[in-house]
Amino acid sequence: MITETLLTICAAVFLCLSYRYAVGRPSGFPPGPPKIPLFGSYLFMLIINFKYLHKAALTLSRWYKSDIIGLHVGPFPVAVVHSADGVREILNNQVFDGRPQLFVAAMRDPGQDVRGIFFQDGPLWKEQRRFILRYLRDFGFGRRFDQLELVIQEQLNDMLDLIRNGPKYPHEHEMVKSGGYRVLLPLLFNPFSANAHFYIVYNECLSREEMGKLVKLCQMGIQFQRNADDYGKMLSIIPWIRHIWPEWSGYNKLNESNLFVRQFFADFVDKYLDSYEEGVERNFMDVYIAEMRRGPGYGFNRDQLIMGLVDFSFPAFTAIGVQLSLLVQYLMLYPAVLRRVQNEIDEVVGCGRLPNLEDRKNLPFTEATIREGLRIETLVPSDVPHKALEDTELLGYRIPKDTIVVPSLYAFHSDARIWSDPEQFRPERFLDADGKLCLKLDVSLPFGAGKRLCAGETFARNMLFLVTATMCQHFDFVLGPNDRLPDLSQNLNGLIISPPDFWLQLQDRH
């Protein structure tokens, strides 16, 4: 009898403690789903929408009738915000400028130290970001720079030659079929974007013959992007899972990608370290190395330079090509939009030269179409996660220090209170009554905002415009034998949204 009573009491205590653990949350924390040991609320999100966690979070927000929800991803408390005011508050308030120390970020470094810019915070982040941006600007980063525009034009001419005449070198067969006009997206765009970006950093570009290295870099970069998710995947919750299920957990592909990308940039750094001459400034690399050699200054060392280069270059060899490919999907699904873009380019630019940045002001519908593509298919739906640097409040709720804070850019870009018809691909929303581009109408945030604003926004917008205008000027996007129109529901969710690799048939317009 006593034994049965004790067992009953123990079971009751266990159930009570389990219930309190599951529903318990810090005082004043936003409403949200219960948590279970080890996984927190992560499994609930997977059940709601296994493929798109940003959509699962928005579903929870609607269930709880709150623009902010609180949950746990493993041991980490997380606040996800879905309102315009809340998203802007996170992006512009420096108290949310921290970065959580997730395993996916730490694994990029051999010693699992978080270096670089993306996943760094505190004095090191501020110092490195300020220094790199200051001196990269001298070489054309973040501003109009005539020489860089000429380099981009050379890259576009090389891309057009590859498309029309087919591969010349072995690595080009991975991007274009023999005979030309059938191209693999998103891979085609990224090496040329990366090569233009390399001119900023190294003051040189690779020749087409040498670009096999860039093709592999782009493939590995996209592989890394596709094998994580908004919240660091299961690897950031239980890192030891990589020892049991290295393939299923995504660790093998993440690690393969990371090792290749890091070694690629390490080789460049060592090349310039070995050839450095004091007082000779060939490019940004020499500027940074000179700072390293002034003494053991805070953060200026070989490993930090490697990861800084990875972070500043990563969007150029992954995100730009992916965003262009997402836009191609929409142009194929909305042929009337494509025709209007092409007609505008024909009228303003003609076919005797490539479009340039001076044409942008005279191509408002083309620019509006690119901006609508950035809005409707948010590349980074949950932004890069932020972290509260101190106890604070957000939308009336208490946010403890070290809470992961997620501004849902996807929710912002699909909010009917802002866009009225967010599900519609409608570039006209950014034009005024006279058909001119009206920047006041574009409140989208595809590159974030505040101190964490994507440093490559200017370069990315310029590349998106020049590549889009060039492709639409020269080609129609048609369906080849056995091709189907893009199915947007098949797009992949990782650190970014990306289309699965697909072959696109092109047809000359002139």
From Swiss-Prot:
Enzyme Commission number: 1.14.-.-
Subcellular location: Endoplasmic reticulum membrane; Microsome membrane
A Pfam family: p450
Name under which the protein is recorded: Probable cytochrome P450 304a1
Taxon lineage: Eukaryota, Metazoa, Ecdysozoa, Arthropoda, Hexapoda
Mode of membrane association: Peripheral membrane protein
Co-factor(s): heme
Purpose of the protein: May be involved in the metabolism of insect hormones and in the breakdown of synthetic insecticides.
Major localisation: endoplasmic reticulum
PANTHER family recorded: CYTOCHROME P450 15A1 (PTHR24300:SF376), CYTOCHROME P450 508A4-RELATED (PTHR24300)
Keyword Glycoprotein attached: no
GO cellular component, one term: endoplasmic reticulum membrane
Family as reported in the entry's similarity comment: Belongs to the cytochrome P450 family.
